[in-house]
């Protein structure tokens, strides 16, 4: 083989390798996980055919669905060069709890509260869909309670009287009544309600780029810094 061709191939491999390595991922590609990415400033990132916000210093964030099965396809474009990265998603086992013999009213809410539930769900969805330019998602997240007891885990699901309920999309922490609760990271409060039907005293924080944290408490609360 001509030496010039060999040099060209080696150069192409070097450039492709450099482009691929210029994206760093902090987080595991497991169902339900949160991934923080770092790329070159000015790069364009597309994940699953959707362009993702990237900060001016190259940070971006995305999450994997609870039941995602297909690979994650990532395209990076910089200075006219396009790089494709494919990541396999690892399957995760979730806890399933079956409870039978419950009174129907404890499984399905009464019709007179349907309108209230629908209205409150819209408030929550609106707050969770905010995709601001805040950059707090880059910071380390902390536990909202010190020495907390975990009573509910992400992805778990209950089947009540044979009817599957929505999976649990968070982590429940238990503490003594009146214990101060910390925000998990810097952010802006986008929803503060004291008496929602399903979640009681509820706070939603926006950390930027579609990243939100969500708390529901026993007692009414006022966020403060």
Region roles according to the model:
Residues 3-11:
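Sec-dependent signal peptide recognition
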Residues 12-20:
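Hydrophobic h-region of N-terminal signal peptides that target proteins for export
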Residues 22-86, 91-92:
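Cationic-aromatic interfacial patches
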Residues 55, 184, 207:
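Short, acidic, Ser/Thr-enriched surface-loop or helix-capping motifs
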Residues 86-199:
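Surface-exposed, glycine-biased beta-strand/turn segments
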Residues 180-182, 203, 213-214:
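His/acidic/aromatic-lined binding-pocket segments of jelly-roll/cupin-type domains
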Residues 207-217:
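Short histidine-centered loop motifs in beta-beta connectors
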Residues 216-225:
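Single conserved hydrophobic/aromatic residue that forms the stacking wall/gate
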């Amino acid at each position: 083989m001509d030496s010039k061709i060999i040099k060209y191939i080696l150069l192409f491999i070097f450039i492709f390798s450099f482009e691929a390595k210029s994206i760093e991922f902090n987080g595991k590609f497991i169902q339900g996980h949160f991934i923080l990415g770092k790329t070159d400033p000015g790069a364009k990132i597309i994940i699953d055919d959707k362009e993702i916000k990237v900060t001016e210093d190259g940070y971006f964030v995305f999450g994997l669905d609870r039941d995602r099965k297909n690979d994650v396809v990532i395209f990076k474009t910089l200075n006219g060069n396009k790089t494709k990265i494919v990541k396999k998603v690892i399957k995760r086992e979730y806890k399933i709890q079956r409870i039978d013999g419950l009174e129907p009213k404890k499984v399905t809410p009464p019709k007179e509260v349907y309108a209230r539930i629908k209205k409150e769900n819209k408030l929550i969805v609106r707050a969770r869909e905010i995709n601001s330019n805040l950059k707090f998602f880059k910071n380390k997240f902390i536990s909202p309670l010190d020495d907390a007891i975990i009573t509910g885990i992400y992805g778990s699901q209950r089947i009540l009287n044979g009817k599957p309920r929505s999976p649990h999309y968070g982590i429940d922490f238990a503490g003594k009544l009146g214990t101060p609760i910390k925000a998990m990271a810097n952010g802006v409060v986008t929803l503060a309600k004291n008496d929602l039907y399903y979640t009681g005293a509820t706070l939603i924080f926006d950390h930027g780029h579609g990243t939100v944290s969500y708390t529901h408490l026993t007692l009414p609360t006022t966020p403060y810094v």
